């Protein structure tokens, strides 16, 4: 099973395309929608829905993946639910760059302080990071610096922030999912 979390642009047709692409490596892809506007509510909702999806699945190695803001949530929710994560161009600091776009960006900072201390150290090796060299939203060299000591980082030379096409990374994702 692959759980897919959309980014800030939840209505983008690209989300459906990504789900279809993910079905090439696992027919059981679950799209979980969330508001993107209310971080604390989103965290509760995502924890509940991801936990429910894991319980309903008989997959011994489910993964969660997301793009942008969905990558932020995938890393945290996946860690808290004990499943591996694949994150594309994650938004590591929505508390800094979502001001004016969501109601309470400061809630992300609150979530970060309440999350398990040094969670990346405890999550080491359980997340695959795929970054675009041409991300027009975030400086992915900083993202790589923040994550490379904990996770494998793969660079993509073609895609932009929204990562419209993920098919070139599907076999890497499949191997990561199946490798204990």
UniProtKB/Swiss-Prot annotation:
InterPro entries: AB_hydrolase_fold, UPF0227, UPF0227/Esterase_YqiA
Pfam families assigned: UPF0227
Domain of life: Bacteria
Gene3D superfamilies to which the protein is assigned, alphabetical: alpha/beta hydrolase
Family designation: Belongs to the UPF0227 family.
HAMAP family per the UniProt record, alphabetical: UPF0227
Name of the protein in question: UPF0227 protein VV1_2072
Source species: Vibrio vulnificus (strain CMCP6)
């Amino acid at each position: 099973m692959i759980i897919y979390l959309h980014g800030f642009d939840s209505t983008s047709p690209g989300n459906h395309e990504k789900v279809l692409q993910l079905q090439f490596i696992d027919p059981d892809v679950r799209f979980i929608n969330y508001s993107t506007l209310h971080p604390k509510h989103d965290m509760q909702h995502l924890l509940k829905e991801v936990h429910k999806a894991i319980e309903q699945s008989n997959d011994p190695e489910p993964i969660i993946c997301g793009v942008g803001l969905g990558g932020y949530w995938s890393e945290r929710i996946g860690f808290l639910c004990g499943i591996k994560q694949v994150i594309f161009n994650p938004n590591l600091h929505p508390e800094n760059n979502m001001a004016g776009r969501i109601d309470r960006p400061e809630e992300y900072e609150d979530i970060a302080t309440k999350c398990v201390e040094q969670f990346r150290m405890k999550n080491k090796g359980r997340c695959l990071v795929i970054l675009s060299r041409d991300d027009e939203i975030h400086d992915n060299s900083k993202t790589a610096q923040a994550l490379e000591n904990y996770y494998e980082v793969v660079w993509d030379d073609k895609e932009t922030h929204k990562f419209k096409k993920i098919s070139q990374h599907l076999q890497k994702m499949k191997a990561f999912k199946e490798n204990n």
